[in-house]
Amino acid sequence: MQARLLIPILFSVFILSACGTLTGIPSHGGGKRFAVEQELVAASARAAVKDMDLQALHGRKVALYIATMGDQGSGSLTGGRYSIDALIRGEYINSPAVRTDYTYPRYETTAETTSGGLTGLTTSLSTLNAPALSRTQSDGSGSKSSLGLNIGGMGDYRNETLTTNPRDTAFLSHLVQTVFFLRGIDVVSPANADTDVFINIDVFGTIRNRTEMHLYNAETLKAQTKLEYFAVDRTNKKLLIKPKTNAFEAAYKENYALWMGPYKVSKGIKPTEGLMVDFSDIRPYGNHTGNSAPSVETDNSHEGYGYSDEVVRQHRQGQP
């Protein structure tokens, strides 16, 4: 009965001992500079911007204000991949046949006894308990084999947080301006605008996962862009577009078997969960929004504010 219980327990330990997914958690970004990362980040940003509903801005002249969360960092996964060689170890030994012959010395003892005219003679043969000669002979060949599994563990993730990358921010700002232009919406300086459009980029970075099981392994890289936008009429301070959220995720995945491969590589993009907290449920205390719209920092994006040089230049031109 105990053996029946022990077998499934050992089997479960064997199956589950090396299974799991390690996720590096960088601060905002993950270091996104090689080609696949660039492709994923650009795809998620394009999808999020392209999905913006701008119908209410048709025929209007808008001023854009874009704020981006710091997004640049670096990270690396070390260790973790396992190879066939000590989670479970067994050995098979094939030894040759060995025969040893011993030669022991023998000696003879004779004893004569006389008593009352009777004489007795006793002869005995003894063997000395120490071989005088030994001979060992082997027959056949010998072999030894072993099989095991070497587990490298789940690995270690290391990351470094840097300041906002101005090129990433400028690229995202240009994507927004391109979509507005293609939609037939004029983007002008704040002095000539009748509508203010505010876009907050909350998530703009990468996620890397590693899945390790005994037979199946996978490396996954994801890029996410999550933004919230709204538009305000400068004349009456009413919201033309209430706060809306767009969130998209692009993924690149490599599938392995015993870390051999990859036998399959896939890429894709899809909508993902929105922001943990958004402003869609905020209502003004009065009948309209505040008299002053959120201001734009006059420092450029190189100082860590997330506005592109073009937006800052337009804002400065509109100042008296």
Curated annotation (Swiss-Prot):
Stretch forming the signal peptide: 1-18
Gene Ontology biological process terms in this record: cell adhesion
Domain of life: Bacteria
Keywords of the record: Cell adhesion, Cell outer membrane, Lipoprotein, Membrane, Palmitate, Signal, Virulence
Coiled coil stretches, renumbered: none
Membrane topology type: Lipid-anchor
Cystine crosslinks: none
Cell location: Cell outer membrane
Family per record: Belongs to the MafA family.
Entry protein name: Adhesin MafA 3
Lineage, top ranks: Bacteria, Pseudomonadati, Pseudomonadota, Betaproteobacteria, Neisseriales
Gene: mafA3
